């Protein structure tokens, strides 16, 4: 299972989290986010990581030009679109960056939210399901209704996100079969400041199901 720790802002923490066994680090490229980090600071962190660890840039309603600007500086391995991007825009991103993994995030409010995913499946590589919040796009600490996902089989790899913590992750995964999990606030002391002990606990708990 892929384990993505999102909202990395400090090089030392990124290195430590990768060394513990996380398979992906997420960098928030959204200026209004408290976890924002610019491309000039992302690249030095990426350079210290093993090549087996994915570096994912998280964008929300950004233009193609903005995304391209970040990628000219930071050698990301994946682009996560966490806003209201249309299938047409996702297609454009994939055409512009065919060598990168394209992840589309969806904020799940009701079962109807899952229906909207269908039109994206053919134009992206990976899905990410997050909790719905009317005011924030992610990192809210809110959990989504895991029961809605009991029969979720999208035909694409997918991440489970939304309020996951070391304490609730095993319960969240009961009856679900995501290809990965994504945590941010659940392993933090404050936005952008990761708690290495919590990451350690998370990975130890995940080993119990393997």
From Swiss-Prot:
GO terms for biological process: L-tryptophan biosynthetic process. InterPro entries: Aldolase_TIM, PRAI_dom, RibuloseP-bd_barrel, TrpF_fam. It is an enzyme of class 5 (isomerase). The keyword Cell wall biogenesis/degradation does not apply. Its EC number is 5.3.1.24. It holds the Pfam family PRAI. It catalyses: N-(5-phospho-beta-D-ribosyl)anthranilate = 1-(2-carboxyphenylamino)-1-deoxy-D-ribulose 5-phosphate. Keywords: Amino-acid biosynthesis, Aromatic amino acid biosynthesis, Isomerase, Tryptophan biosynthesis. The keyword Repeat does not apply. GO terms for molecular function: phosphoribosylanthranilate isomerase activity. Pathway: Amino-acid biosynthesis; L-tryptophan biosynthesis; L-tryptophan from chorismate: step 3/5. Belongs to the TrpF family. This is N-(5'-phosphoribosyl)anthranilate isomerase.
